[in-house]
Amino acid sequence: MYLTLIVLPLLGSISSGFFGRKIGVSGSHIITCSSVILTTLLALLAFIEVGINNIPVTIDVARWIDAEALNVMWSFKFDSLTVSMLIPVLIVSSLVHIYSISYMSHDPHNQRFFSYLSLFTFMMIILVTGNNYLLMFVGWEGVGICSYLLINFWFTRIAANQSSISALLTNRVGDCFLTIGIFAMLWSFGNIDYNLIFSLAPYYNENIITMIGICLVIGATAKSSQVGLHIWLPQAMEGPTPVSALIHAATMVTAGVYLLMRSSPLIEYSSTVLIICLWLGAITTVFSSLIGLFQQDIKKVIAYSTMSQLGMMVIGIGLSSYNIALFHLVNHAFYKALLFLGAGAVIHSVADNQDFRKYGGLRPFLPLTYSVMLIASLSLVAVPFMTGFYSKDLILESAYGQFYLSGTIVYFIATIGAMFTTLYSAKVLYLTFLTNPNGPLNNYKYAHEGDLFLNIPLIILAVFSIFFGFLTKDIFIGLGTGFFSDNSLFIHPNHEILLDTEFAVPVLFKLLPFFFTISLSILSILYSEFTPNLLINFKFSTLGYNIFSFFNQRFYIELLYNKYIVENILTLGGQTTKSLDKGSVEYLGPYGLEKGLLNLSNSINNLSTGVVTTYALYILMGLMFYISTLYFFNWDSNLLILIIFSLFVILNNKLLQK
């Protein structure tokens, strides 16, 4: 069952990719969708067997590397963390496959698209189930390449080319540091197997653990789009909308958070790594929320909300609340996939326009889409008893419940980030569905709900966004739960804060995020409805324009990167090419050799004068050279006689030819 779970998406991908012309579009849909749906059902069985019944499974398939210094197995590990990650990955992936049947129905390259989707799912399964860092790295690189292929799916568009290369190169920075971290583990521990490294970690110097942990954090920063290496995430919106849902909800962006959670028995022994995670997540949360508030593209706003929620998960890791971070990851996958697929339904119905300032008044035309996006937005802003409420608020309470200065400051920073999340969620809903129509007539003339394939995934995800958090909170974060008794998540006894979070945090600080959520939602809609001129006048003032430009241009970080990093690297590369590749290498290599041989042949050619006395002089000089050689180096006289005889024969032949 477990190997079938891993292999099925790969078989679907190969069938659709290599035999797409034989099986046709419908055959590709049937094979890939049925493969992923069957894999999802097997993952649910694995969740019950491994997670609920606490029966972890390890499967050794074959030996990969068998060297004296390194032994690596094709080994797959199914524990509570693995099966918890498989649930959102495969449920969202299967629903995205179904959704794409309708969304991509007019695209001529359906087989290629579904092949990429299934391959993406397979690589994520490899990443999650691998039993050592090298196998995990195979999946890690695989999802990176698949994201490049999917973002660049419409490869005739320049924007798609640029975005995919940006995603690939930004992730290469993180991959480089992750590789260094894996080599450091190999050098320190002599192996890269999870069990061996985690069992030895308590006995190693904290500085070594810190160095390895920082490399892992930088790798996770790129993949999970934290501040500094975040620029690829909004640009990835150039891909088709189902791709955005798959990348930003369930697969690629969660890989970095998974890496840190899987490495919890390692990074728990380095307080430096934990404090870096704490502050990195806090800065990312408020940073991305501020940018998202000033974006006008519906998909980019949702992308920045993803970045903000990933910051929340990294805060949970920095607090050693790995189970809460995992719970938030699973919850977030459902309502974020719903937001993206809902946005895709809106874009699909209004002639592929993504600027939500040109929407407005779509609620009567798209009642189902409005309902599901309202549910997803309520879950995103953590309205009580929605799925997002049970994990997001608990992360904030854990930050305060740590009772350190850093934790308290992070609590207030993350609360501010949650406030801005509320504002842009209300903004998207209001400007898309509730305000007066702002778009051209054609947008509304042909606006319509999608077919069954578009609507079924929306309804299923809406149900998950309402009920999943309540139904599973005791499994993931209950005080007496035995779900993680297999030690897949390790919390050092000194870092255990769940009891303090539950019982010691004052009620005021538990209710503060909820108070801000409700009050800001109401205030933003009231301002927009009753005093729009006040907002418009402020925006057109010098101060308002400067503030809007600063945040709309994403703190000018990309401008700084281009000016001070990219330009310098390109200049250095140009100079290197000019001086080495096109300079000394070619001068000493092909061009230099050719020029030298031509000069040598011309020089030899000049010796052929056609005058007999000149040739006699050459013979005399040669004879003197060989005699002196014999004298100085003691050569055999027979050899000299042979040489002289040969010279006379050659000379005689030349004279006869003339």
From Swiss-Prot:
It holds the Pfam family Proton_antipo_N. The chain crosses the membrane at residues 4-23, 30-52, 81-103, 112-129, 133-155, 168-190, 200-222, 243-262, 272-294, 301-319, 329-351, 364-386, 409-431, 452-471, 505-527, 607-629, 639-656. Its main location: mitochondrion. GO terms for biological process: ATP synthesis coupled electron transport; electron transport coupled proton transport. Coiled coil: none annotated. Its EC number is 7.1.1.2. GO terms for cellular component: mitochondrial inner membrane. It is a multi-pass membrane protein. It is an enzyme of class 7 (translocase). Belongs to the complex I subunit 5 family. This is NADH-ubiquinone oxidoreductase chain 5. It comes from Talaromyces marneffei. The lineage of its organism: Eukaryota, Fungi, Dikarya, Ascomycota, Pezizomycotina. The gene is nad5.
